[in-house]
Amino acid sequence: MSHSHPAGLLATYNSLTDKHLAGYFNNTRIRRHLLRSGLITRSGRILSEKEYKVNNMKQDHQKYIRECLARAIFHKVLDMERYHQLEIKRKLDTLARKERIQRLKGEHTRRFIEDNMPVLTPHPPAGPKTNRGHSVLAEEGRSSPLTLTAPRPYTAPGNMQPPVRLQPLLSSRQTRNGSKITSGSKPKGSLLESEALFPLGGKKAMMKFRNYMDHSQKEDLYQLPHINSYHTPVPPTPQPQAGKNFRDKRLESWRRKRLRPITAPNGLEPLFAKDPGRIYKTAPHSNAVITMVYFGKNVHLSYDDIDFRDEIKIYQQHCGGENLCVYKGKLLEKDTFQFISKRHHGFPFSLTFFLNGIQVNRISSCCEFKHRRSTRLGGKRGYFGFVCVEKASPCYRCIIAMGLDRKPSSTKPKKEKITEKKEEPPNKSQGKLRKDRMNAPSKRNEMERKESCVSAAFSAEEIKLGVKEVRTAIEEMEWKGKSGRDVWEEDQDNAVKYDYEEDFEVDDEKQDEKVDEDEDQADDQMSGGSKTPTESEKDNRNPEKKIETSSEKAHDSENEDTGCSDSEEDDRQDVKTMSSISSRSHPYSSESEDDSTEVGGEADSVSEEGSSRSSSSQDLRENDDPGKPHFPIEKYLETEIEEQEITEGHNGPWLTELSGMHVTEGKPTMGIQALSESEHKEPRRVASSEVRAKSQLQKEAGLPGVEEEVGQITGGAQEPGHCCSNTAPGLSPTDDGVTPMRKPEVNLGRGTEERAAISANEQPEQDAQEMHTLKEEAMKKDESSQPEDTDAHAGVREESGMQKDGTCHPQDAGIDVELRERVDMQEDGTCHPQGADMDVGLKERVGVQEDGTHYPQDADMDVGLRERVGMQEDGTHHSQDADMDVELKERVGMQEDGTCHPQDANMDVELKERVGMQEDGTCHPQDADMDVELEERTGMQEDGTHHPQGADVDLGLRERAGMQEDGTCYPQNANMDVGLREKAGISEVLLGERSPTGVLLASAEQSTEKGECYLNIASEAEAGTEGSSRHGEEQLIPTGKVAAEGSVFLSVEQARDRQKDEDLDRQALLQTQMEKERAVSEAGQELKAEFTDSGGLNSETLEEAAVLKEVGTSEVKEAEREVGSPKTDGDQGEEEALTELEVVGPVEDTGPERKAGSEETVLGGERAATERKDFLEEAPISASTGEVQASPREVFRGNHELCKEDTAREGVIADTESTAEQDLRAVFPGELAAAGGIEKVERLTPPLRETGSEREEETGPEVLKTEDLLGEQKVKGEEEGTAKEVGSEEEDRASRPEMEAHAKDVEPTGATELGEATKLLEDPPKERAITLSEATPQFGKSPKESEATATEHKGGEELPGQESKALWPQGRGLSHDGEGLLGAPGPEADKAQGPEGFFTARCEEWAAKELDSSAGSERLEEDQPLQAQREDIQRMTQGNLSGERLTRAVVVCGEAKAENPQGEGSEDKECPPGTVTGSLTGQNWNMGGNIVEAEEDPHGGGIEEPTAEQKEEESAESKSADGIPEASSAANAQKETWDGAGEALGEAAAEERTGTEDMAPRTEKVAVVEEVTSAGAMVETEQEQAPEAQDREGGETKASRHTGTAGEDTGSTGKDEEHQSGAAEEFRESVSQRETA
């Protein structure tokens, strides 16, 4: 086929005509394909394009036509079907209408007849005539049966009609029409009843009823119905008919199941039960009685149903087509039910099971006989199972499978012999019985060898069925009053006549030959054995049959002598049956090894007799006639019974008495005495002496065979005249008058008698031991019990000793052997039932009470609980103690009254550990139910209750709050972190009051009442400080929400008072620290710079929080300023510090670690570490204990040197910790940086600034700002010159004095702290606070949120320290709050420049972890572009921070990315998230002015530094914010701050590359980055370290400038703050632009 191509040869090319492809297309397969495709014809001609298209069109048309035809046919069929349905409906309507008409006509005619026939037909008057001329009674009598609605005869019991005037009518008509009454109405009524039970239904049933009523009316016209309203009419028995008679007998046959063997054919009745004059035919149905069990459902869904029974229906397909319901009923689980199978012969046995109308199982098998074994249908989860199948005959398939069709020739002689033996006269049988018993031991020895083979022949199922048959036969023998012989002979005759008489003897018959061979070998081995196996079998069988014959007479004589009633006889036989079952439960215990083969001597015969006892059941089984195949044990049982009776008859009344006593569990000693009195013969005496000697020796030796030999010797000594049966051994008196009794069975009573007989003088203990030994030996030897001892189960009798009085208590007999061993019997010799039922292990652990009874509660108590919980003095356990959780009990002491309050028990363990119990020993439910996080954030009120809003306080807040003076632990104090508690001890000085949790909460509460959200933030700061583990949780919390949650409403005046009191102490501390700081001013300043860089994270976060606060709550800030102005600087410093700490919350969780040395970590380099140590000495004074505690986490931010320095700090902090926790916060450079950020936040919240605590915090944040400004100015200095930096420093100095003045206005303490902070940070706290306030309004962040942010920043510093512990490799770049997410200083990590480089690498790793990506650390690497890192930071920020912060973080990252590639290089790449974050963090503290300066144009290559004018504006704005927050200036400052943050990113990267020496510049940049990041995440705060590396690179000139005079720093700070406000605005604008982009 040609294909269209552009032009040339390709346009006309046809592959089919290409000669080069001729060979290809000549391929048969290809040609077939082309032919199918229609490209060539059958002849091979290639079709043209036109022909091909025509052919395709034709094919498509044909396909379309076919589809149309199919559619038409389909619709036609639908129309036809619809029409057909309409026709059917119309016909049905017609039929129904006709039927309705006919019914109406019939009813009309019948009414007419009923009304007129009585009038037309003459009959005696039945009563007063009505106007219509018929009897009222007659009308009433016939009205009910003629109604169509009652398909029951009018004689039914429901028709209660009073006999009105019946006597005269009945008297006259009974004589004349009595026969009609009997044959007419009653039979038909009964017929109707039987038919109504299974109505055919519908029209046919109604017509049948109608016809019947018509006929009955005609026949009963001349008589009234025979009505008796008080009796149910019973129709007379119909005339016997052949069919009916057979049916009745067949139905009764299964009820007489005990009279017939199980394998009897179902269709045939025993001959004696049938009438020989009639010919019977086999029933078509199997009529097998099937017993099943309903196991129940696995899942029960309907619990509201009162009736828990399930409806069961079983249908049987009895003849191949029709289903018949053979069972229907409601059953509970484990219920058994019976039904009769109606399977027709030749059809399979098929059942369908329905459970509540749902088919659940089906079975189909050849016949019922196949299911004779107990099986569960459907596996483990089946609903039904077979219990037994009776009257089931095997089908041909089963007969062939079981081999029943092959009958050995030996079976018939056996049957004949059995019948002959039974027919022998009793005298001969008795004579032979004696001889056979003498020879029985040798024969039984032979049979013992055969038992193994014979036992295999009998399956467990056959044994069970055999036991059933035995029981049935014995019961029938008693019930029918027939002799055992007659019953057995009838059974034998029936068995001979049945074709499947050997259902259970198949294996036995197959092994007959093997048994004969074994017998021959046994005879050869026996010394005295000369008989052939057949003779021995005959000998064994003859005595058995004779025993049966004589047993009948003996049985009668026994009844006469003992006067036993039939009921007693039944009881005995039942007991014997049980004993036989028990003996069969231990089939064929081999004892031939213990038996001797000698037969000559009497003593030897006795030993053989012992073995014969054990093998009696075996012999009987082996010798069971094939005629009774399914009675393997029945003969044995019967033989035992007969032998017992014969023995009793020959021995006289004494033997009968003995056996009766044993059967009834009488005293065995009485029987022994009777025997000893009745028998006094020489041989027995000799035997008794021998027995006694041997038994004495064996007893002394402790041999188990004592009992056996005793029995053997006794048997040998007995005279032949003494009838010794195989199972009932004779008894001979010994010389001392004691009759040693042989233990023929595993009978405890017999064993006891033997022991008593052997040694009457021995102690009961020895007897008991010997008895136990004899019991074990008897169990091994003989599992069958003697007839007279059959009442006691063999095992039970052995294990339960008889009492001194010779009686065995039933409860003792039922006691488990192991239990008996462990549980001693009481003194009275009886075992208490409760002791018997008690678990052995429990009894071992739980002592029996003095009264010998166990308390149920002790028995039920868990052992472990008993061990842990001591019993009360009264010896009883309290249920509540027993139920108490062990772990809870360990932690919760019991009350004085010894009881545990439920509410205490239910209290969470962790909560109980943190929250002390009230003085009354009870825990308030609200405390127990309070969310852990809620409790951590909210301190308890003075009344000891929690305010819901305070319940959300972070757990970390609870950890840092100390106990109150009253000794009770407020939940927030109780939850104080252990490390914090250790580092910040509870001091009597105002530590608890001034603690962030205590005083700051109070001040926060007060300010919150007045609308000061910053106090709320302070609460959060506490929460954050204590619960820094909740990463960024507070950051994520909306400002308003945080304020609401963290705020504790207190009046401003109260907060003021508290803070003033605390500020006094803090002022003293601050003064002391300031002096220390002066000593190490420059070193401290450098350390401050570095520490500020480390703390710059916090400052950034704080500034970021401040920005957010200002944006969210500009108005609130004004109110807070107003409210906060009254507060002392120290108070607000505390509160703001707390606020910062709270905002830094997670960071301050590291606070304790900072105290330990986290501040050292803040310092980037060794030099920084050293300086920072000095600074730490100063810092602890200004910083609050909480800050100090928070500082330990900062320690980990930096390198190990920082940690060391932190250790030094810890020493200093320890000193200052008790006095001023918040002061320490303000003092620490890192914390001061954080505090600076916080103060910026506080600027956002003017009240904080106004208060003394605000001054402190402002001092810290402003110091950070100063450092940031210095850093930025240093950056400018690098770019523009150091002169500009000097100017900025001067501005910082100027601003710092202003702040100091403001602090002094607020409170002298605040001024002192400001002075210290100014020295440390060289940044006026006032201006810094203004910067914070300005930055905050821009972001619209509520004061609380801003404080939370500031706290987060602070935490950024501190937390990095904390995290640096856990995440030391990650560095401080990441905080628990998620600040570290954005801040993972990559460049420093890659550079590994000093401690800061190392710290930066750690921060990068932490950032990677925070980002949950393996690339996190790589982002921190130099290779990764800043953009990727920025994206990571964004993700981290988004995960942990609010939208504003995320946005800022993104912007910062973006700017950092832009800046880093331009100005920084690979280090900038490293900087991305971590460095940028770090720089942002460090610079955020200084964002007010330094950010603007450090901020690079995101799009520009160089770092944009805010002009001096901008700085001145920023300073002015900060000052104005310090006095009155200006939203515009704050916005501008924030924008500038953001711009500065972007620049700071670039600068931070550049500086980090340049070196890590300049900690201040790095801190500044970090502050810028932090503030930007703080908007994004406080995680960036931790990455301050990366910026620190940049700051170091930026030059130590910045650090030197930063560490310059305080005046220069202050002046630079003022400028920086001005620039920061402008830069914040610019930065925010750039952020907004980027967001819009």
Swiss-Prot record:
Point to the regions of Basic and acidic residues compositional bias: 416-426, 443-452, 478-487, 534-557, 619-638, 677-693, 769-802, 1115-1130, 1264-1307, 1319-1329, 1342-1357, 1402-1412, 1550-1568, 1589-1599, 1614-1637
Instruction: Return the Pfam families for the record.
Output: DUF4590
Renumbered to this chain, the Low complexity biased-composition regions fall at 579-590, 608-617
Keyword annotations from UniProtKB, A to Z: Cell projection, Cytoplasm
**Per its database record, what is this protein's job?**
Component of the primary cilium that controls cilium formation and length. May function within retrograde intraflagellar transport (IFT)-associated pathways to remove signaling proteins from primary cilia. Also involved in neuronal vesicle biogenesis and neurotransmitter vesicular function.
Q: Where is the composition biased (Polar residues)?
A: 169-185, 1476-1487
* Compartments where found: Cell projection, Cilium; Cytoplasm
Protein name (Swiss-Prot/TrEMBL): Glutamate rich 3
Q: Give the matching InterPro entries.
A: DUF4590, ERICH3
Q: Which domain of life is it from?
A: Eukaryota
Q: Which organism is it from?
A: Mus musculus
Give the main localization category: other
Q: Would you name any one GO CC term?
A: cilium
Q: Where is the composition biased (Acidic residues)?
A: 500-523, 558-572
